[in-house]
């Protein structure tokens, strides 16, 4: 399940629903030529309350330009953690594109208040200051991506390891390939184990190794 809350930069003039051809809602607005309508949406895998909390905390305004600038700043900060010495623009493009791809997942699944819905269908609460992650393609990422996270983002890497442990407790076994509070069981092997072990052996803080 996914919950969402949407805000428009101006009130809609009319709304129509269609439950015959599918669950479709059509909004109509009184706009003039060249006017821009900004649509802001927050999502939650927990509940409607989570979606509301997320939009209030993470999307408080309707300026697309500000969101764009914030996104660029965040990505520049992340990508600048590794600098390569080369004058070859093609080499830089390949390297930073690969680094960008490595940071697209896992993703934060908990809401801004730290709540998240587990594979058991129950809403759980992260420890204060921590986040719960999802979308673990462990078969693809245990060799290089996760060891890289322990260097570039140790706090996030610790939360990822704890997220795998928590998922295992809530689901009865460690995840193979989990996505949004569910187990897809894609790929072979059991690669949550080396991810967790690597984080524990590197003594990343915040991991319950006895769970």
Segments predicted by a language model, with ranges:
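Extracytoplasmic/secreted proteins, especially bacterial periplasmic and envelope-associated proteins
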Residues: 70, 74, 90-97, 143, ...
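Alpha-helical support elements that line or immediately flank enzyme active sites
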Residues: 97-110, 134-158, 194-203
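Helix-terminus loop motifs that line ligand-binding clefts
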Residues: 116-120, 124-126, 156-211
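Acidic/polar, glycine-enriched structural segments that form the non-catalytic walls/loops
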Residues: 1-132, 174-176, 205-210
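Secondary-structure capping and boundary motifs in well-ordered enzyme cores
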Residues: 90-91, 131-140, 185-192
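A conserved hydrophobic secondary-structure block that centers on an alpha-helix together
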Residues: 21, 85-88, 131-135, 145-146, ...
């Amino acid at each position: 399940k996914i919950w969402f809350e949407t805000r428009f930069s101006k009130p809609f003039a009319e709304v129509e629903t269609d439950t015959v051809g599918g669950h479709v809602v059509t909004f109509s607005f009184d706009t003039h030529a060249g006017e821009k309508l900004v649509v802001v949406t927050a999502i939650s895998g927990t509940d409607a309350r989570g979606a509301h909390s997320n939009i209030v905390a993470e999307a408080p305004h309707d300026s697309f330009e500000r969101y764009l600038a914030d996104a660029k700043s965040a990505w520049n900060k992340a990508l600048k953690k590794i600098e390569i010495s080369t004058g070859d623009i093609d080499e830089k493009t390949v390297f930073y594109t690969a680094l960008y791809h490595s940071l697209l997942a896992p993703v934060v699944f908990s809401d801004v208040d730290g709540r998240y819905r587990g594979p058991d269908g129950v809403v759980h609460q992260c420890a204060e200051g921590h986040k719960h992650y999802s979308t673990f393609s462990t078969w693809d990422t245990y060799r290089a991506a996760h060891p890289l996270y322990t260097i570039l983002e140790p706090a996030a890497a610790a939360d990822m390891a704890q997220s795998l442990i928590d998922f295992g407790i809530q689901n009865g076994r460690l995840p193979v390939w989990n996505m949004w509070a569910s187990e897809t069981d894609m790929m072979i092997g059991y690669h949550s184990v080396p991810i967790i072990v690597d984080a524990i052996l590197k003594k990343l803080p915040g991991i319950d190794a006895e769970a």
